[in-house]
UniProtKB/Swiss-Prot annotation:
Something else known: Present with 937 molecules/cell in log phase SD medium.
Family indicated by similarity: Belongs to the ERF4 family.
Stated name of the protein: Ras modification protein ERF4
Pfam families, A to Z: Erf4
Gene: SHR5
Keyword flag Endoplasmic reticulum: yes
Function statement: The ERF2-SHR5 complex is a palmitoyltransferase specific for Ras proteins. Palmitoylates RAS2, which is required for its proper plasma membrane localization.
Membrane topology annotation: Peripheral membrane protein
Quaternary assembly: Interacts with ERF2.
Source species: Saccharomyces cerevisiae (strain ATCC 204508 / S288c)
Annotated keywords: Endoplasmic reticulum, Membrane
GO biological process: protein targeting to membrane
PANTHER family assigned: GOLGI AUTOANTIGEN, GOLGIN SUBFAMILY A, 7, GOLGIN SUBFAMILY A MEMBER 7_ERF4 DOMAIN-CONTAINING PROTEIN
Keyword Amino-acid biosynthesis tagged: no
Length: 237
């Protein structure tokens, strides 16, 4: 049985532990209410700020048709779940808006439009829920991110594996001749894991794939510098 002193210590440790949230989102209080008659931006109080949860599609040419009709939802990296996540990118498996420190509303995991903000008159909600919730369930997102995280872990294992490290040492001893002659053979597993991730993403985005059928596209992590796992979604209206 746990005594009261131990319980107090456990509660203190829990309260001091930082809660995870999507650090890509931010709030904004000066915006135009949807359905307002004057259609002019006004200042809102703390409880009615917009949560900016989708962003310009930087993977499309600015001014292009795709840029105009799509937005990007960013799933953040997690650094707190394992030591390896500090070296190897590992992304949150939680649907944006369901994180422990997310801003929540009365509508649960539904993306509810509240107001317009930004030059392009983009529509946002007042909670951390993003438009991605309209296309993927929490379980579907978790499955996709688990697979991506697994590919990245295996790729990192090959990068720091004996083949690659031996090749680096031999490269130093031979003045680069090793890489020129036999390096590609030993580095092949690294490229195979990278190729496997690319193939998985291509499968999701191709006809018949989960994301393609939902009108969503996953961006390869390397294109964002592995700072976030980006999903291209239709622009909310």
């Amino acid at each position: 049985m746990c005594d009261s002193h131990q319980k107090e210590e456990d509660n203190a440790n829990t309260s001091e532990r930082a809660l995870f949230f999507n650090y890509h989102e931010f709030s904004y209080s000066f915006y135009e209410d949807l359905g307002s008659e004057d259609a002019k931006p006004t200042e809102h109080d703390e409880d009615h700020k917009l949560c900016i949860t989708h962003f310009p599609n930087v993977y499309a040419a600015r001014g292009s048709a795709e840029f105009q009709v799509t937005r990007v939802v960013r799933v953040p990296r997690r650094f707190d779940e394992s030591r390896s996540s500090l070296e190897t990118p590992q992304f949150s498996t939680q649907l944006p808006g369901s994180e422990p420190a997310a801003i929540v509303g009365d509508d649960g995991t539904s993306f509810v439009r509240c107001g317009r903000y930004d030059i392009g008159d983009h529509v946002f909600g007042c909670s951390s829920v993003s438009p991605l919730s309209e296309y993927l369930s929490a379980a579907e997102l978790a499955e996709v991110v688990h697979r991506v995280n697994g590919f990245l872990l295996r790729e990192e294992g090959e990068v720091f594996g004996w083949r690659n490290l031996s090749g680096l040492l031999l490269d130093m001893l031979t003045g680069g001749l090793w890489s020129w002659v036999l390096g590609p053979l030993l580095s092949r597993p690294v490229f195979q894991e990278s190729l496997a991730l690319e193939q998985y993403v291509a499968q999701l985005n191709s006809p018949g794939g989960l994301l393609h059928e939902r009108g969503v596209r996953l961006v390869l992590p390397r294109r964002s510098g592995c700072l976030s796992l980006d999903f291209v979604v239709p622009r909310p209206k």
